[in-house]
Each structure stands twice: as structure tokens, then as C-alpha cells.
Amino acid sequence: MVEIYYDDDASLDVLAGRKVAVIGYGSQGHAHALNLRDSGVDVRVGLPADSRSRAKAAEEGLRVLTPAEASAEADIIMLLTPDTTHRKIYADSIAPHLSEGKALAFGHGFNIRYGLIEPPAGVDVFMVAPKGPGHLVRRVFEEGKGVPVLVAVENDASGNALAVALAYAKGIGGTRAGALRTTFTEETETDLFGEQAVLCGGASALVQAGFETLVEAGYTPEVAYFECLHELKLIVDLMYEGGISQMRYSISDTAEYGDVTRGPRVVTPAVKAEMRKILDEIRDGTFAREWVAEDDNGRPNFTKLVEEGKQHPIEQVGAKLRPLMSWIAK
């Protein structure tokens, strides 16, 4: 079973006298920086001189430096920019200032797991990854609660890396809810698999295939949209709140019978075998190499596939129907 740490297992005293730099001010960056500051941590934000986020961070009372300046000052450097930017930011702005005794932290393990960043041996390397978007991390913190986080230690040069990671997690509110111990490998591989096979790739492909099946059988696209895309949120919300069993309890008997008898005909053993292939590509580095090469090459195939997806008929139907839904923010 996973080990879970709470407020009593962590101490902000570990961060006393230590300077923290949060590199990036996007969804997670702003939440980490503001929560740490409100927890009494000495924090500064590292942003490029031309970043549009500099003014916002300054307006919110944070000290704003360049990534290099922030890294030079800090004892603990948390890198919270997009994965594809990490290598350059690390090489240009962090590595020259990453002296022995410092700590390098991440919100996702991708670049460490696949060896794209290799910190020196004398540096602690840890991860604190909230299991929720930044705006939720900030809002719940202000309410006196927290969002669960994953914590991991990749390199414990100081012998105190876990205590530092837990103190950081406490500073952003994570130990209020629970900090689950994991590894960089487990976090990275499961996160990528979830995105590709279930949450993003799997769900979007399933929705499109269902929509196409109904339209090709002669049903109106608008009704197909409601049945295959729009109502998905209703079901996911039930699962989110109480699991699959609670969702099944909440739907009609007809829907539940169709679920348990027809669902396995959609996600067949062949589908699960393909899921395993996707997982194997994540574990052996095939996906990482493919994605890094695609990004380094200007993302031609990625851009083409995204643009093709925008042309799917379900997008046009949705654009026509969503204005009818007053509860959706426009």
C-alpha cells in the first residue's frame, strides 16, 4: 500500500532560512508560489524578461527575477514550465547555478525519468505533483484545505531530501489532504499512460467513434452529439464523486444493464492488449524519444493531427449546440 504523509509528518521549519525559486507562472507555478508565500516561505519567481506573466506575478506581490537570477539566489529550485522547455531552461539558467547542497524539484517526472536532465550528484532531486489543476490548488488552499499531492525523491544527496519535499508539499497545502509517496518512474509512466490510453486519447477516440457510428447509421448529428459527448460529463462526474459502483447506482437499471453487458464488448481483450503496447512504449522510452524528436523538429505531424481533429464533424456540431447551453461559460 502507498505511504501517505499528512501535516503532522511535515515541518515548514525545514524550509526556514532557505530560499525557494519557482520557475514558471502558469497553472501550477502561480499556485505554488502564492501558497508558499502565504505559508511564510521565502519565495521568488523566475520568468524571462519578456514574459507576459511578470506583471501578473509582481501585481500579486511576488518578487520576480529571470530564471537564472532566481536559480542563483535559491537553495531550492522548482521547475514548473512545460516539459518541452525544461532542457533549455535547465541548461541555460539552472545548471550554471546548481551547486552542491541545493535541491532541484519538479512537478512531473518526464525529464528525469527519460534522462533528458541529469543533475549533479551533490544535488537533491525531488518531485511534488498536485493531483489537480493550479487554480484548484490555490482556491482550496485559501479555504484552509488542500489538494492531494504525489511526492518522490530521485536523489537524496543531503540525506534530508524527503523532509524537504514534504515541507514543500506542506507549504502548498498538499499535506492537508495527503502526500502520497511514489517514484519519478511510477508518476511519469502512469501519468503518460492515463493521458494516452484513457483520459485524453482513449476518451476522445471513443467519443468520436460513437458519434460516427450513430451518424453513419442515419441518426441526426445533433442527437448523436448529446448522447456521445455532452452527456459524458454527467457520467464522469458521478464516477469522480463516488467511483464506478456509485455511478452505476445512480443511473437507470436499463443503463446499468447495458453498461455491464455491452461495455466489455467495446473494450475487448484486443483493446486491452493495445493498451499494454502503449504502456510498453512508455516504459521502454519509445514514446519519449518520438515526442522529443517531434518537438525538436517543429512538431509537423503533431500539428497536422491536431488540425485534422479540429475538422471532425463533431466539432462543428458542438459549436452549433453549445450556445443553447446557458450554463456553459462563453
Curated annotation (Swiss-Prot):
Binds 2 magnesium ions per subunit. GO terms for biological process: isoleucine biosynthetic process; L-valine biosynthetic process. Substrate binds at residue 252. Transmembrane segments: none annotated. Keywords: Amino-acid biosynthesis, Branched-chain amino acid biosynthesis, Magnesium, Metal-binding, NADP, Oxidoreductase. Its EC number is 1.1.1.86. NADP(+) binds at residues 25-28, 51, 53, 134. Its cofactor is Mg(2+). Mg(2+) 1 binds at residues 191, 195. Residues 2-182 form the KARI N-terminal Rossmann domain. PANTHER family: KETOL-ACID REDUCTOISOMERASE, MITOCHONDRIAL. This is Ketol-acid reductoisomerase (NADP(+)).
